[in-house]
Amino acid sequence: MAKKVTGYLKLQVPAGAANPSPPIGPALGQRGLNIMEFCKAFNAQTQKEEKNTPIPVVITIYADRSFTFEMKTPPMSFFLKQAANVKSGSKLPGRDVAGKVTSAQVREIAERKMKDLNCDSIEAAMKMVEGSARSMGLQVAG
């Protein structure tokens, strides 16, 4: 028989940098989960990722205080800022241009994010990436 799920917890944790300090410690601790077990497992799975890359993680909490977690791909904004070589998006998207990304970079980001996006084709994924870029004030060239 399957374990009874009592809840889900969504966090964004830097790759290889999970530790019991806030925000991870309090979020897991108040639900009675083993904080160090999560930190060790997460850090082991993210050691091949670039350090401090934000990794969204969904933790499934069970009634017996055990858990499983699923890692997603880093946020699209992280990839776009990296591709455009900017620290943050525009304060006035649509008016001010914060940077530029090429179609090749958009395709590369779409291919990396494909498993987390709700679309079937790479072209649809590219349109989602382009929309996110425009909402950040980035110009899509090419």
From Swiss-Prot:
InterPro entries assigned to the protein according to its UniProt record, in alphabetical order: Ribosomal_uL11, Ribosomal_uL11_bac-typ, Ribosomal_uL11_C, Ribosomal_uL11_C_sf, Ribosomal_uL11_CS, Ribosomal_uL11_N, Ribosomal_uL11_N_sf
Keywords associated with the record: Methylation, Ribonucleoprotein, Ribosomal protein, RNA-binding, rRNA-binding
PTM comment: One or more lysine residues are methylated.
GO cellular component: cytosolic large ribosomal subunit
GO biological process: translation
Record flagged with keyword Oxidoreductase: no
Pfam families, alphabetized: Ribosomal_L11, Ribosomal_L11_N
GO MF term list: large ribosomal subunit rRNA binding; structural constituent of ribosome
Function statement: Forms part of the ribosomal stalk which helps the ribosome interact with GTP-bound translation factors.
Family to which the UniProt record says this protein belongs: Belongs to the universal ribosomal protein uL11 family.
UniProt subunit comment: Part of the ribosomal stalk of the 50S ribosomal subunit. Interacts with L10 and the large rRNA to form the base of the stalk. L10 forms an elongated spine to which L12 dimers bind in a sequential fashion forming a multimeric L10(L12)X complex.
Name under which the protein is recorded: Large ribosomal subunit protein uL11
Gene that encodes the chain: rplK
